[in-house]
């Protein structure tokens, strides 16, 4: 509900802004029309496909919509199916694919026109951890020599691959910068302390707790965000993106 998908649709010129404008090289994208769209590759959160199409036929179909000639489309489709590890399933119907396979096909169709700007709206939503890692690696591989804009609410999606992060809340941008810059806001406000397991849940409920971990020796480590907790053994630790996320979205900062 922060406005991520709306922002993605605005960037793709699917929706027009009610105020303000989006510029590309100093020009409003609304006036650029097809010239702008030719630079884009877009994977929406729920991309449409014909379930009885094979993966290869689907890419040929999207290539035709994008104006690619047939010879170039066939060559590019084969290359992309290989790149997203779907070449063995190229003749299989899409309705037989897993969620991760469909998402990999989705990024392949977004890359057909070799876009300068690749926009991905929550591409890892619903994927299992293994597919999520595979998809992140795929995004990193495709990011060379192009701008990749990725929306997600999953911190690990951006923690390892993003050079710059925009954090949104209630339709507003509240942070922009590289991971080190934006996490510096809560330097000195992240703590770890050890408590007996019997008191762990009580302490966790009393503070903005980002993690609770049982360790050997019958102890529990709490990771707490905010002012120094009352436990004497509390020590400051380096903040992470997840800590910052919880600071803003779990009681550390009001709307």
Identify the meaning behind each predicted range.
Residues 12:
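Helix-to-loop junction immediately C-terminal to a conserved catalytic motif
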Residues 20-31, 35-36:
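Conserved ABC transporter NBD signature motif
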Residues 60, 64, 71-89:
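Conserved ABC ATPase "signature" region
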Residues 107:
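Hydrophobic anchor residue at the start of the ABC signature
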Residues 93-97:
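Conserved ABC ATPase signature
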Residues 118-121:
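Catalytic Walker B motif of ABC-type/P-loop ATPase nucleotide-binding domains
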């Amino acid at each position: 509900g922060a406005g991520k998908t709306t922002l993605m649709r605005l960037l793709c010129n699917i929706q027009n802004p009610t105020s303000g404008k989006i510029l590309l090289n100093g020009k409003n994208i609304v006036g650029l029309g097809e010239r702008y769209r030719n630079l884009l590759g877009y994977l929406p959160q729920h991309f449409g496909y014909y379930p009885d199409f094979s993966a290869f036929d689907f890419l040929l179909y999207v290539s035709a919509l994008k104006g690619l000639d047939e010879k170039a489309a066939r060559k590019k489709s084969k290359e992309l199916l290989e790149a997203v590890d779907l070449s063995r399933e190229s003749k299989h119907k899409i309705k037989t694919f897993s969620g991760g396979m469909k998402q990999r096909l989705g990024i392949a169709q977004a890359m057909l026109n070799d876009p300068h700007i690749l926009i991905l709206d929550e591409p890892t939503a619903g994927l299992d951890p293994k597919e999520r890692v595979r998809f992140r690696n795929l995004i990193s591989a495709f990011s060379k020599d192009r701008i990749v804009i990725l929306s997600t609410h999953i911190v690990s999606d951006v923690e390892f691959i993003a050079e710059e992060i925009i954090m949104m809340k209630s339709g507003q941008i509240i942070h922009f910068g590289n991971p080190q810059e934006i996490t510096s806001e809560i330097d000195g406000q992240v703590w770890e302390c050890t408590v007996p397991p019997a008191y762990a849940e009580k302490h966790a409920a009393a503070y903005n707790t980002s993690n609770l971990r049982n360790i050997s020796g019958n102890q529990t480590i709490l990771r707490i965000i905010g002012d120094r907790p009352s436990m004497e053994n509390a020590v400051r630790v380096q903040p992470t993106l997840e800590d910052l996320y919880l600071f803003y979205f779990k009681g550390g900062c009001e709307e």
